[in-house]
Amino acid sequence: MSNIDWDLWLKKPTVTIGQACALSLGIDPDKMTHRDKERDDFQRRLKLLIEIVFFMGNIRVASTNSENIDSEIYLDSFSEWAVNIVHWDTPNELKTLVSGTSET
């Protein structure tokens, strides 16, 4: 796991789909390696997230890109979905963006 600058990431209103997946796994998107992108858990989350963003509308979208992984979504909307809808195990820092959740 990378040492994530949560102070920076939690202030960003939008992130790319790939960055959101990385953050949800405790990987620093700025330090993500090709090996990180090949991890099964990253690929599973990425595939599901792309489907949800483009076909379900459960996550607010800021902008789309022909490279789906580079489309931008709202981090708070993603966090709400990841924590409360699909119940992913995410870093506590990401959970602080979910309504009614306080940092522990």
Question: What residues fall within each predicted segment?
Answer:
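Low-complexity, PEST-like segments
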Residues: 1-104
